[in-house]
Amino acid sequence: MLAQSFASSFAVERSFFSASFDALLQSPDAYLAVASRNGRVIGYLLGFDHRAFFANGRVAWVEEIMVAEDMRRLGAGSLLMASIEEWSRGRQTKLIALATRRAADFYRSLGYEESATYFRRLL
């Protein structure tokens, strides 16, 4: 399960994953995108948006983004990020934020800037 590759502190439980997946699909504030190649899921992005006073509007948050290690640097991550940007623009979101300890250069290459301990891109 690709989500297990993301988790470093917790083991992803299949039953919780299944229940969460169904709930996320029903949530109007959740965004889930999947990247595939030749019928194989090679990446996913899970994000949300919400209202925030500091932004004078909606803020999107990339909660999880993962691309299979053997499929990195082929454009899947960029496409996943572009997809949440498009979704966010359609919802009049003001910015997208995420926190990461890895891949800072990747996010910078997409136009995100370091802000405190997270990256953001004004939309």
Model regions and ranges:
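A short helix-loop-beta-strand connector motif used in the catalytic cores of GNAT acetyltransferases and
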Residues: 22-34, 61
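Conserved beta-strand in the GNAT
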Residues: 34, 40-49, 66
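Active-site beta-strand termini and strand-to-loop segments that position acidic
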Residues: 36-38, 121-122
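Conserved acetyl-CoA pyrophosphate-binding loop and the N-cap/start of the following alpha-helix
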Residues: 71, 75-83
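Conserved active-site alpha-helix within GNAT-family acetyltransferase domains
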Residues: 78, 90, 94-96, 100-123
